[in-house]
Each structure stands twice: as structure tokens, then as C-alpha cells.
Amino acid sequence: MAALGPSSQNVTEYVVRVPKNTTKKYNIMAFNAADKVNLTTWNQARLERDLSNKKIYQEEEMPESGAGSEFNRKLREEARRKKYGIVLKEFRPEDQPWLLRVNGKSGRKFKGIKKGGVTENTSYYIFTQCPDGAFEAFPVHNWYNFTPLAKHRTLTAEEAEEEWERRNKVLNHFSIMQQRRLKDQDQDEEDEEKEKRSRKKASELRIHDLEDDLEMSSDDSEASGEEGGRAPKAKKKAPPSKGGRKKKKKKGSDDEAFEDSDDGDFEGQEVDYMSDGSSSSQDELEGKPKATQQEEGPKGVDEQSESSEESEEEKPPEEDKEEEEEKKAPTPQEKKRRKDSSEESDSSEESDIDSEASSALFMAKKKTPPKRERKPSGGSSRGNSRPGTPSTEAGSTSSTLRAAASKLEQGKRTSETPAAKRLRLDTGPQSLSGKSTPQPQSGKSTPSSGDVQVTEDAVRRYLTRKPMTTKDLLKKFQTKKTGLSSEQTVNVLAQILKRLNPERKMINDKMHFSLKE
């Protein structure tokens, strides 16, 4: 063999002998560089075949004769294999992997797997130099790649499958727990938001039995509480001879009752207490004493009228003077308050109409002097308060009522609505006739036309409360309450919705309108 170099003059030749018959077979052991194998540190090495796969290639040993044997079993098995093309592989020990143990039990272990196809297209030779300087070349039969074995115990296929199923269960458990935690966090956040909203809107919280009751806002509920809460308050009225401080306490307690009351709470009682109870509660709210019970016309309950008249008879003259002063003072404030409330919402306007109609009559009665005429005769007033007996003073009192009502009508034409005028005129013939069957004056149980008006404020209030469809809005403004036809109501609602331009959302395939506060 010639050594290639810069100059062709220096040539060295070697003799290579290839033996024809060799008893030895040479194999190559390949180690990975990352394993950092150093042969100089090996003190002891043991190499053996791994024959653990021998059981796979073994056939089941069946008896050829005697008990449990089959006739021509081997022939039938061979015929079946030929039919399906099954070729049995023989167990060859030379094809099995090598096990290499270095430095005893405490050392490393390697497993050498035969690499196939290495000697198909190439021939590898191992050169060994002889003492005479010649080289002997031995062909390589097999190539083995050695990899280190892990010292820890590994799982079998069945154990690995069981662990894999367990892994899925564990992962599913973790995912379920994580979902629960996320749900709990979301619920906590929602609860915190609800608490914040409830703190901000604590005054607006109302509990309603029916959907139609939601039409009344917090202001409306107070106004309706004034009308509906008048009946029970008349019975609870204490004798007014105890001074002005108790009156102030009464006012505070009445306000609390108005906040809790709602529309329709006293419908069953309002017929019995319409004429008497409403007037007494109205007088208490305005800070005015109660007028004569006889002038009011029909009485609801006899005991109420008697108790109220007795309490009025017991009043000293000093309190009469104070009450006369109180009568004159709050009238402009009442007008101002009624105007403001009528501008705020339609529902509050309805309650103001009722209160104006009743207060106009009672103010007229209080300005007339029959109160002093009635004082000396306590028994006669008690007798006249009976609902069945006609009163002799009814004609004079009704004429004074009409005169006072006409004066008030001229002063309040600008602020009063036609409904209030109609209510006031209707109370005139009622006061004349001393019948025992009371007529509802407030129009609460039998709604008249025009009680509810389709306004922009009302629609805005409903839409800010919750998303609503046009059908829901039409239910809120019924033709019986508004006094309009269905076509007119639809047109007015369409114009108001155009002006408000609310947000549109599709909920359950239905268009819902809503407004933000």
C-alpha cells in the first residue's frame, strides 16, 4: 500500500493476507459517543446472549398419542399455514442481542442489538499486523450497536397499559377539579358584583307578586302607598290632644309604611275605607287637622267616624289656632310638590291627580266654619254620623263645598288635568246623598281611561330595568289603562323607540330592546 504524500518518492508497501479458512468470526461493537465509554477503565467485562425471547418462538407441546392428542394435528397445522401464507421463524441464538456487564454487578450494563443490512452492499475488514510486518485481513460478519441499560426496573407492556389508563383517570380528575375551581371563582365574582349592585341600588329594591306591578317605580310605590295605606292608618290614629311632637313621629312612621307598601296591597279594604280613611291620611300627610266627618258625605265605618269626631271635640282652642295657621302655610308647597311629581313620571301623575282631587274638597271644607257650630252639640254630631240617617246640615255644607271647589278650580286650571276635574265634580252629588254604600273615588279598583299614559319616561324606565320586546311593552300599556286604541299605542311606542334609539339584542330568536342607566 502506497502512502500518499506531497512527494511520490517516499513509497511504503505492505503485504496484506486474507485467510481462506478462518474458524473465528469477527463482529463490530459500536458505542454512542454520548455514553462516554472508556475501555481502559474496564477491569472486568462479561458478554452473553439474551435468550429471553426463546419462549416466544417455542410451540406448544401437545401429546402425539394418548389422552389430549389429535389425529394428524401437525399435518393440519402445516396445511393451514400454507393456506394463509404463514412462515414460522426459527429461534436462532446468533441473532439474539448481546448483554454486556462491565465491572461486576455494581458496574454498567449494555445491550447490543444487531444492525441489519450493514454487510449487504459493503464489506468491512479488520486488519491485524503480524510479527513479520504483514497484515492479515478478517471480514466483519455482524455489526452491533450497544446502548446502556437503565438500572431501575421498567414496566412490562401490560403494566404500562394499566398505568396509561390510570394516567387518563388522574388527568380527568385534575381537569374536573380545575373546572370546579373556575366555576366557583366565577360564582364568587358574580356574587360580589350582585352585592355591589344591591348596595348601590338598595333603595330601588322592590318585591312584586305580579309582572304588572313592576310598572310602578320607587316613586310610584310611595305615591300608591299614600292612597292604599290610608285605610289602616285611620284606625290607628291616636287622639291629637298630646301635642305636636307625636304628630312628627307619626309622619315618620307613615313615610316608612309608604316605602314598604305597593300597588294593590289594600284593594280588598279600600271600598270600606275609601271616603273616611283617605281623607284622614291625607290630612296627616299635609300636616292639617281632620275636617268634619259629616260634610264628607257617605261614611265607610261607623266606629271610625265616631272616634274621629270624639277626638276632634276634645281639642282645646289653642290647638285650633295652631291648626288654622298650619292650614294656610303648606298650600303653596303642596302645589309645587304636585307639579314636580307630575313632571317626573306618568304613574306618579296618577297618584297626584287622586290626591289633588281629594285635597281640594278637604281644603274647601276646612275653610268653612261648621266645625265650631258642631262643637257644643256632641251628641247630635254623634247621631248625625250614622250612615243611614239623613243630615239636616247636608244642604248648607254641600253649597259651601261647591263654592270653595269653584274657587279652587279657577286657581288650578293650568295645573289640573281633566281627570282630576271629573273626580272633583263626581264627589259633589256623593256628599249630598247620605247613602251608606260608599263609592270608590280614587279610581284605583276600576281604572278609568287615561290613567296610564305612553310617555318617553315610562318607556325609558322599563327598558333600563330589563330587556323587553315590543310585545312586552304593549302589555305594559294596555288599552284599558291608556284609553288609546291598539293602533295608536303602537304608533306612539314606535315614535318613542325611534327617539330613544335603544340597544337591540337577539334573545331566544326575539328582538329585545334595552337602555343603559
Swiss-Prot record:
Keyword annotations: Acetylation, DNA-binding, Nucleus, Phosphoprotein, Transcription, Transcription regulation
Biased composition (Low complexity): 377-391
Biased composition (Acidic residues): 210-225, 255-270, 303-325, 343-355
Region entry Disordered, spans: 178-458
Residues bearing the modification Phosphoserine: 217-218, 221, 224, 377, 380-381, 385, 391, 431, 433, 436, 449
Tagged with keyword Plastid: no
GO BP, sorted A to Z: negative regulation of protein binding; positive regulation of transcription by RNA polymerase II; positive regulation of transcription elongation by RNA polymerase II; response to virus; transcription elongation by RNA polymerase II; transcription initiation at RNA polymerase II promoter
Chain positions with Phosphothreonine modification: 156, 331, 389, 437, 446
Superkingdom classification of source: Eukaryota
Bias (Basic residues): 232-251, 364-374
Subcellular location: Nucleus
N-acetylalanine: residues bearing it: 2
Subunit structure: Heterodimer of an alpha and a beta subunit. Interacts with GTF2F2, CTDP1, TAF6/TAFII80 and URI1. Interacts with GTF2B (via C-terminus and preferentially via acetylated form); this interaction prevents binding of GTF2B to GTF2F2.
Purpose of the protein: TFIIF is a general transcription initiation factor that binds to RNA polymerase II and helps to recruit it to the initiation complex in collaboration with TFIIB. It promotes transcription elongation.
Name of protein: General transcription factor IIF subunit 1
Organism for this UniProt entry: Bos taurus
Protein encoded by which gene: GTF2F1
